[in-house]
């Protein structure tokens, strides 16, 4: 299926463009769209090196998480220096993993990353954990099967959250809503009532990026 990108707001449209078509985001006409040609996301596609990059990414990612868990154990045991070194190493491993993830062409813009994340969560709750739970039940590990299903339900909510955030990004509603909203500065706590968050916090001068819709759950 053909893909076209709006040259103004970068919205991607799948399918042919009609003469009266307008961008759903910025309302530009079809003439402002250019066809997007699919290409490999990385120069290593289909090679052994690509497989090695994925293996390196997985290994570094696991090492990073293990180090954070080990740091927690060391801290509880009273070994502050060892805990700190575990955490320092974890940060190193995170950067190593990022190198290989970027080389694989997997790090996109925020909209692409939200979609990627949502698709990953969808796989986890619809396929991966469902299969794991069934196999655990078959082997008699019923408590673990219940945990797999419990985590699957959480992953489902994660997918829903990512898709809601993606919709906000695509429709430009991250910092502007259709009605009056209470906005809170994530840095200093200043509250603003209005349709949109201010360009800058009038109290601490942090930019609009620090504002979010105020929420109370107590």
Residue map of PLM features:
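Non-heme di-metal
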Residues: 2-218
């Amino acid at each position: 299926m053909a893909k076209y990108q709006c040259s103004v707001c970068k919205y991607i449209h799948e399918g042919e463009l009609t003469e009266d078509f307008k961008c759903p985001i910025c309302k530009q006409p079809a003439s402002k769209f250019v066809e997007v040609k699919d290409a490999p996301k990385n120069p290593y596609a289909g090679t052994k090196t690509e497989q090695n990059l994925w293996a390196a990414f997985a290994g570094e990612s696991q090492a990073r998480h293990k180090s954070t868990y080990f740091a927690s154990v060391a801290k509880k045991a009273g070994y502050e220096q060892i805990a700190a070194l575990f955490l320092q190493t974890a940060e190193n491993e995170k950067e190593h993993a990022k190198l290989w993830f970027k080389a694989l062409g997997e790090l996109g813009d925020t909209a692409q990353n939200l979609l990627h994340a949502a698709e990953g969560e969808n796989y986890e709750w619809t396929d991966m954990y469902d299969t794991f739970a069934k196999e655990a039940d078959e082997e008699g590990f019923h408590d673990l099967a219940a945990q797999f299903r419990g985590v699957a339900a959480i992953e489902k909510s994660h997918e829903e959250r990512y898709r809601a955030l993606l919709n906000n990004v695509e429709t430009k509603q991250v910092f502007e809503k259709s009605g009056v909203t209470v906005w809170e500065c994530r840095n200093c706590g200043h509250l603003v009532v209005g349709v949109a968050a201010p360009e800058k916090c009038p109290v601490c001068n942090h930019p609009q990026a620090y504002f979010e819709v105020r929420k109370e759950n107590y």
